[in-house]
């Protein structure tokens, strides 16, 4: 499949269909059994750190265990993937604090201070911290895995707006979601997986329905 610049490509399917596995193979977190991932004409390696440097980032569905270090501050979590930038020639604490404060303001992260531990934030605000740390890296491709799971309605809309802002600025997004209402609301096209196989890529036209997506997800090619 192809991901276009400024596009949100949805990935739908039943639990266990292989959507997260595809995403982790793309970024180099899982080793591929076959096939290649090409980005800007270059075949990507199986190195997660190198692919992040190239501008491809993954926001895990498990933000508490994979997305955040809960016992560390909001500032530390935002800075962690970006220490290479911040450590030239030494770690610049003031810049870390200033950047964290900027993201707290721009993403409307509800926290007492930038030094508040991530474990003390709500689910929606934790997700915003995860987003902030990758915004800091100026990525081009964002893979959002179940980005609004366990988040209240108000925070969900804020996450959607952040995603819209990203694509309006030229980034591309892959959005893995089990919420078909969300998929139809957000995505330009929908890739449907079943038992590890990509069954279809559907244009999100006014005629596309949840029922059609479910048919592909449950029965395969129609």
Please identify what each model-predicted range represents.
Residues 1-222:
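Glycine-rich phosphate-binding loops of nucleotide-dependent enzymes
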